[in-house]
Amino acid sequence: MTTTKQKKNSKIRHLEYYDLQNTLDTLYADSGRGKIFNNLMPLIESEENIRLAYRNIKRNSGSNTSGIDRLTIKDIEKIPEAKFVEIVRKKLQWYKPKAVRRVEIPKPNGKLRPLGIPAIWDRIVQQCILQILEPICEAKFSDRSNGFRPNRSAEHAIAQAYAFMQKSHMHFVVDIDIKGFFDNVNHSKLIKQMWNIGIQDKKLLCVIKEMLKAPIVLPNGDTIYPQKGTPQGGILSPLLSNIVLNELDWWIISQWEKQPAHNVRDHITKTGAIHRGRAYDAFRKSGLKEMHMVRYLSLIHISEP
C-alpha cells in the first residue's frame, strides 16, 4: 500500500504521463534567460497539452458546474478523444468565447463576491493557455509574490512574513489591500506587460484579448461588455493578475531592498563566507525605512522594525 508521503504530486504525474514536463522545464529555463516567445500557439494546440488540459479540468469539482451553455464536463466526456482535440484546436484558431455567467457568492462580512463561470469549452481553452504560460511567467515572478502559483499558497505567504520578522527583528506589519483590483485591470496595460516579459506571440495575445472582452450575463439576465478587469472565476485570471502586479513587486524590492546597496560589493572573508554588512550600512545611510514585502494576490504585507 502506498503511503501519502510516497504518492507523487498528481500535477507532476499528469505532466509526465503526457510527456510535457521537459517542455515546460525548457520554457522556464528559456524565460529565465530572457528568451522572447513569439510562436507559442503550436505548443498550446498540441494534442498532449489539450489532453492534459482536459485531465486538469476534469479533476476540478467545478467542472460539474455549467456555464451559460448549460454544458459540463460530463457532456465533454461523451465526445471521442480525436474529435475533442480537433474541436479545441478550431476554437483556438478562431477564438470567440461565450458569455460568462455571473453568480454572487456570500462573503464572511455579509457582502457578495461576484464570480464568473465561463462555458466549459472556454475553461478548457484557458487551461491549455495556462499550462504553457505558467512556466514562462514563473521565471519572471518575484519570490515575494504568493497566491495561485505553484507551491505559493496563503500558508507560504504567512510563513515568509513570519520568517522576515524573526530574522530581521521586525515588529510591525502594514497590510495593504488593492480595492477592486480584479475589476479594474487595464486590458491594454496587461497586454503590454505580457509583451514586456517576453510573451510576444501576437495570435496568442489576440486570443487573450477576446477572453478579456467576453460578455458577462448578470444574475438578473442583463448583459454587460467589460472594458476592463479580469473576470473572477476564470482559469487564466489569477495568472494575468499576477502579471499585472509583477511590476509592483519588483519596484518595491528595487526601491527598498536593492537600490541603496546596488553599488556596494559584498565582502568575502578569509573563510570564503560572504559578509553583507557593507550593504546593510549603505541601506542605513540611505534614510529609507528597513522593510520587507510579501504579497498574496492583491494583499500586500509590509514588515517594519
Features from the language model and the residues they span:
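Residues forming anionic-ligand binding surfaces in small-molecule and nucleic-acid pockets
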Residues: E104-N109
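Non-catalytic, polymerase-adjacent accessory regions of viral genome-replication enzymes
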Residues: M1-A82
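Conserved polymerase palm-domain catalytic core
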Residues: F84, L92, A99, K140-R144, ...
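Conserved phosphate-binding loops in nucleotide/dinucleotide-binding enzymes
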Residues: P114-A119
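Nucleotide/phosphate-binding loop and acidic/charged catalytic motifs
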Residues: I129
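Amphipathic alpha-helical blocks
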Residues: D75-P97
